[in-house]
Amino acid sequence: MESGPRTRMVLPWIVVSMLTEGEGEDLRIAAVALVSSEAPKDPRAFVREDAIAHPFMRQAVLKATPPLKDAYPLLGGWVLEHRGFVLFDRFGTQLKALEKEFLRYELPPLSFAQSPTLEVYRSIAPKARARPTVERLIQENLGMILSRGRDSITAMWLKGEVTGALEALRQDAIGLCMLLDLGLKRGTVKLDGAPIPVDWDRRLRSAVRAGNPGLGGSR
């Protein structure tokens, strides 16, 4: 029996940056975790301030040292916040890796089995299939998914253990990606209160070609 044509597996890229603001109980951490299935191709593209909706994310991007000059409009994105810990994931822009400020991870193709949040996903996946929306499930379980965000990641960051903090964030970003992908496929996840259309990937590509790296009318 002949097998069908093989699909070339593309390594996802994850770029992570963190920015702190305030001290003690008022400490906030902005974490930018951007995922793409492709390496950046067009070095002429730049970060557009109007494409970065969340002001704290804008600070994390624009206050990087040295200043960010190159960024690349790519696939998909959303912003979530939980207990002062802000996670930005797949925002449609992949940042150029900068020494000390950014770490780039090249990972094998993602699967649920590779996620450290696999047990979390398994526990809520049956509920997600049984309900018309997964948005509430994501919100209800965000604290469990990002449980390290307020404790371990913050503690590591304050101790100067930047690599450990970024690695923990990367693991959570992968798990959250999977949960949000489930919502995107159902067309139920919302960004800034507006539903992301089922054909969000086509709309985004069209928006990028038109010079707008935002979500193409879905905001």
Question: Where in this protein do the model-derived segments appear?
Answer:
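Internal catalytic-core helix/loop-beta-alpha segment
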Residues: 97-100, 121-159
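Acidic, Mg2+-coordinating catalytic module of metal-dependent nucleases/exonucleases
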Residues: 140-201
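Acidic catalytic cores of enzymes that act on phosphate-bearing nucleotides/polynucleotides
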Residues: 196-219
